[in-house]
């Protein structure tokens, strides 16, 4: 899995690496991760990408280590793969601990957690712990997103016992000791917090029993409140408000980054829309539709720029990536699009807001193209998007067999 880079391309990349200083007045911040995590404040050098074999049972899930250092001679190459040691996990989302020393990786189907040491040697992460009995420990199934809070990890769990019914949040120490489960009234997908307001919001999708079936057998009537967002008291881990929309499957959510910002956004997959949540003076939240992303988009992920000027939406069904201008938070506008990128799913924006990496596998049961890859979009100072023609890792032609790349983190 190598990029075909000419000597000229490498030379240009190295030259570009030396010019990554931000222009005066621009903001740098790592986005779309917990505010408790020690932030990356310099250009990325390595990417960790959590992936699974394209064919069920075709091998173990793995953490790919990718060189993304523009000044490196191995830029754009998969340096190694760290195996999970088991099959059938359905590798999905990953998250750092607050001190950025460990990476937690969740598995949708097997209810396992994999903990990697990424601090001792960042270029050579090591699998140091596997938690096998998550369902028995927590009473919850379908682990989705590991999210850092001080000294602990909260994992959004989609469903209850046996993959059915509402899920909740499972709380662990950074080392993997189970603390408690916190029941939800829907199927938690993602978590975002705003510590200054003592508020946490979780979005929703569907239970584990759904995605483990072929798409033709999915039954939305078995889903619990998939059109809701839950507002929690962060310290008490208690639900204090339910935000409801007519559209179902409220996936990725992002809180505005600016200190004191009382608003944020999430996407509705079934409703092809962006929604805005906003904290009012009385402590409750307003919730309204902010924009339609277009019929047939099938929004899968939502990311933001470090300066709160742009949102990025991946349209999994329509094969495009959208940039939305949110400089006026109450009146957001479509700013730019890239089309023809096959089933884009997870994205990651760099600390300087100039690069957006994306993968193109969602879940084994709904992927519709076998052209699996990880690609890069360059973001101009004007917010315009341009697909980088020199950066593409073809996971469909991986040496050990085709693989589905899902979530990624930079270091």
Give residue spans per PLM region.
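Short loop/turn segments immediately following beta-strands, especially the blade-tip
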Residues: 66-74, 115-125, 234-237, 276-285, ...
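Beta-propeller domains
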Residues: 97, 185, 194-322
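Short, conserved, GDST-rich strand-edge loop motifs in beta-rich repeat architectures
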Residues: 41, 49-57, 156-165, 203-226, ...
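Beta-rich, blade/repeat-based domains predominating
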Residues: 31-38, 85-98, 136-152, 185-199, ...
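Blade-loop segments of beta-propeller domains
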Residues: 75-147
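Beta-strand-rich domains and repeat architectures in extracellular enzymes and scaffolds
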Residues: 29-68, 74-108
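Asp-box/WD-like beta-propeller blade repeats and closely related beta-sheet repeat scaffolds
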Residues: 121-196
